[in-house]
Amino acid sequence: MTQRRKFFKDSLKASLGLALFSSVSTNVRAESSAAKKSPYTISLAEWSLREWLNSGKITNLDFPETTKKVFDIHAVEYVSSFFKGKETDSGYLRELKSRSDGAGVRNVLIMVDMWGQDGALASPEERIRHAAAQNHHKWVDAAKYLGCHAIRVNASGYGDASYRDAMGYFADGLAKLVEYGAANQISIIVENHGGYSSNGRWLADVIRQVGNEYCGTLPDFGNFRTDLEGGNFYDPYIGTAELMPYAKGVSAKSMGFDHHGQDTTIDFKRMMNIVAAFNFEGFVGIEWGGGLGMPMDAEAAIKATKKLLLESI
């Protein structure tokens, strides 16, 4: 099957899936998950332990073993900044892989954050988009060595471009990078991560334009803020449903908990019903995003998120 034909099928699946999402109650699963093995594997996003990493309590090399020992989670999602510039150091990567393999922990993906011109995949200037795609190649190489299936990138650099223009710029820059990813069998996935990318329809349209099986999304439950200064939000449930047809992972972000152990911003059960409606199978990554003023440390928050996620599946 050609990649283009596959994406036509994905687009049809998107339309059918959204119809299903609209017609099925978001409070009750159409099919009991208790009757079959869960199609999900829980992973942990490294950003959840940013305080431990920034304070020196642990390092990037310690992350896999810490994840297993402290949280009984056996899959990890790295963040580029915690490599501290060692992403091309073969000795460092070898040590990281040795430690993750030794702990029996799966390396899932690397979240790559290059916010300046070096990572501007959506720049209005073609030469900058081209350079940005090449600047991401080292992360594809690192992901491949570590045994990850993907890197996550951002839709950045479009500045004041219009909705349509920014879409075209990013689709072009992303396609350049996806070509390299596909050649190395590493998927390039995009998270809703602010600005236009937090508009589910916009990001889904970008993925359709790229039209490559190695290009997809990483829907994040909590990142649907389209305007940081204005505080504008895209509906997270609609946005997640729009991104799920192209999902190669799911980011279950938590921000705080009430006295019943429920997230204070997102209905996890409703979100996981949406994920299930699209027959997703793969990694669901826990990401502790904050606390909204609640006195909860990272360890307690991650464990609370894991408990809530397991109850919601």
Model-flagged regions — what are they?
Residues 70-71, 146, 245, 278:
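Structural motif
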Residues 297-313:
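C-terminal helical cap(s) of enzyme catalytic domains, especially alpha/beta-barrels
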Residues 23-53:
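C-terminal segment of N-terminal export signals and the immediately downstream linker at the start
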Residues 44, 67, 100, 132, ...:
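Conserved, mostly hydrophobic/aromatic
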Residues 1-19:
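N-terminal secretory signal peptides and thylakoid transit peptides that target proteins
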Residues 10, 75-76, 165, 171-273:
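Acidic/histidine-rich catalytic cores of soluble enzymes
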Residues 54-69, 131-141, 232-240:
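Short, acidic/polar
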Residues 73-175, 182-187, 223, 256-260, ...:
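Structural motif corresponding to the early beta-alpha repeats
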